[in-house]
Design a protein with these regions (language model features):
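Long, compositionally biased intrinsically disordered terminal regions
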Residues: 26, 31-150
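Single conserved position on a long alpha-helix in the C-terminal lobe of the eukaryotic protein kinase
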Residues: 1-32, 36
Length: 150
């Protein structure tokens, strides 16, 4: 990673609710996060929440182990569900209640769109690549060091 000043990795797979992002600056990991849907599935949570994650309203999982981060995401999801139920009981449709709770507070689980939005804030949104003019060039693929696995 020391050959590049800013290295990033992003991943998502909607079928299994998998999302991941990693950023290293000047060869030092700044943020590593990965989640796969269901059960205890925060796979890794290293580093402090970045300003961009906060702007996207991701839950602040700074300092939490994967298990603690997973518990926090599910706690937030339960809070949001309870608020949605309260809004439905007050007369809103379920759809309106979901929309309203998504506008406030942290997101319980980041999704595919969140990953590309974060990519755009850190560097380039991959969804915008077809509209951009980039010269043919060499791409780089690298293996993450084993000591980054939590």
């Amino acid at each position: 990673m020391s050959r590049f000043t800013d290295v990033q990795f992003y991943g998502s797979h909607r079928v299994v609710d998998f999302v991941a992002w990693t950023r290293a600056i000047d060869g030092r990991p700044v943020r590593i996060f990965a989640y796969a849907g269901g059960g205890d599935c925060v796979l890794t949570n290293i580093g402090e929440q970045t300003p961009e994650e906060a702007k996207l309203r991701f839950a602040n999982l700074t300092g939490l182990s994967p298990l603690e981060a997973n518990d926090e995401l599910f706690r937030l999801a339960e809070e949001q569900r309870a608020e949605q139920d309260r809004l439905v009981a007050s007369g809103l449709s379920r759809r309106e209640a979901i929309a309203r709770t998504r506008q406030v507070g942290p997101k319980s689980f980041p999704g595919e769109c969140d990953v590309v939005d974060l990519a755009g804030m850190w560097s380039i949104n991959p969804m915008d690549l077809p509209e951009q003019d980039h010269p043919v060039s060499v791409g780089w693929v690298a293996r993450l060091p084993e000591n980054l696995v939590q």
